[in-house]
Amino acid sequence: MRRALDGPGSSSLDTRQADKRQVRFRQCYFNPISCFRK
């Protein structure tokens, strides 16, 4: 990802978004019913 080179805060923001996406993916994987209900 080249966006991390744009600035000092962009990389942390990208990682934060990736973490959120990973958490959501994990919830969907282990509990698909609650994931699709939203």
Curated annotation (Swiss-Prot):
Keywords of this entry: Cleavage on pair of basic residues, Neuropeptide, Pyrrolidone carboxylic acid, Secreted
Tissue-level expression: In its non-pyroglutamate form, expressed in antennal lobe (AL), corpora cardiaca (CC), corpora allata (CA) and gnathal ganglion (GNG) with expression in AL detected in most animals and expression in CC, CA and GNG detected in few animals (at protein level). In its pyroglutamate form, expressed in antennal lobe (AL), corpora cardiaca (CC) and corpora allata (CA) with expression detected in few animals (at protein level). Not expressed in GNG (protein level).
Gene Ontology, cellular component aspect: extracellular region
Residues spanning the signal sequence: none
Domain of life: Eukaryota
Subcellular location: Secreted
UniProt family annotation: Belongs to the allatostatin family.
Protein name: Allatostatin-C
Lineage: Eukaryota, Metazoa, Ecdysozoa, Arthropoda, Hexapoda
